Amino acid sequence: MNFLEQPSQGSIQLNGEQLETTLDKNGDLKATNPKQLQKMRTQLMMVFQHFNLWSHMTVLENIIEGPIHVLGLKRSEAEERARKYLRKVGLAESVEKKYPSFLSGGQQQRVAIARALAMEPEVMLFDEPTSALDPELVGEVLKVMQSLAEEGRTMIVVTHE
């Protein structure tokens, strides 16, 4: 969906807009309009099994990176948005100055979810979001995902839960 892998057939639509594609020399689909693909990618945020937080950045810095550099938000706006989504995933603002290595796996995954939410996407893609967690931490991440589902957020989830 996000063209991390080249599809061989089919179509991708988001909010009624179909991604323009053509077949490449190998018979795989490729996007014909890079700007359209980039726009769609900003609306499809991914949360991975292994959090993918930058270890050299604080929680707050991890969350504001995309909104500032991709969406063009001012730092103050991005920080406000980051704090809003930290609260949404059940993390107090007291964690915003911590580095990922000082957080539990469940907290790191909730930061990853807050980071994706800070982009305010149309669709959230979750790839095994709980499989790298200790069993006692799975519930806190599932609770956040359930909350997102209850508010009507579109999510595509690959999981063994």
Put a short name on every predicted segment:
Residues E120:
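Conserved catalytic motifs of ABC-family nucleotide-binding domains
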Residues Y99-L103, Q107:
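Conserved ABC ATPase signature
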Residues E17-T21, D28, R75-S94:
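Conserved ABC ATPase "signature" region
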Residues T159-H160:
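H-loop/switch region of ABC-family ATPase nucleotide-binding domains
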Residues N2:
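Helix-to-loop junction immediately C-terminal to a conserved catalytic motif
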Residues M124-D127:
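Catalytic Walker B motif of ABC-type/P-loop ATPase nucleotide-binding domains
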Residues P135-L137:
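Helix N-cap at the start of a conserved alpha-helix in ABC-type nucleotide-binding domains
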